[in-house]
């Protein structure tokens, strides 16, 4: 996946979270869905998600769209749909923590991202299902 070079995003590096002393992923069972998504999301074409941020140059760096896509995909897969419940899970649930690490989005960030990119998620879900079918 090609990332735009102009815009600076808050860093998202799930592999680095595994190096932490308290790595949440270490406590998850092998084969957990979150590992599949952490491997899958960087391979998705998220260029349209990034494009919407390229025009805005003011303010602090936004969350990496890949983090928010991964977070929402996982939340939907496990039946968590409310942005407030997703944000709460990012504080307590090991699988959610494996995605967000120490940089946890609040409910408004999650909600705004979902609203702003709702039309793009149908393509992402289709792409994920295709890759999952290939993987078996």
What are the language-model segments listed below?
Residues 1-136:
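Detector for conserved single-position "signature" residues within domains
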């Amino acid at each position: 996946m090609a990332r735009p070079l102009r815009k600076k995003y808050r860093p998202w590096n799930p592999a680095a979270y595994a190096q932490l002393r308290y790595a949440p992923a270490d406590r998850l069972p092998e084969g957990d869905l979150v590992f599949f998504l952490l491997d899958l999301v960087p391979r998705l074409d998220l260029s349209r998600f990034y494009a919407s941020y390229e025009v805005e140059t003011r303010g602090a760096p936004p969350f990496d769209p890949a983090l928010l896509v991964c977070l929402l995909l996982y939340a939907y897969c496990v039946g968590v749909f409310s942005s407030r419940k997703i944000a709460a899970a990012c504080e307590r649930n090991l699988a959610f923590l494996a995605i967000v690490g120490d940089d946890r989005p609040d409910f408004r960030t999650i909600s705004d991202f979902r609203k702003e990119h709702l039309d793009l998620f149908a393509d992402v879900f289709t792409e994920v299902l295709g890759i999952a079918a290939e993987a078996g």
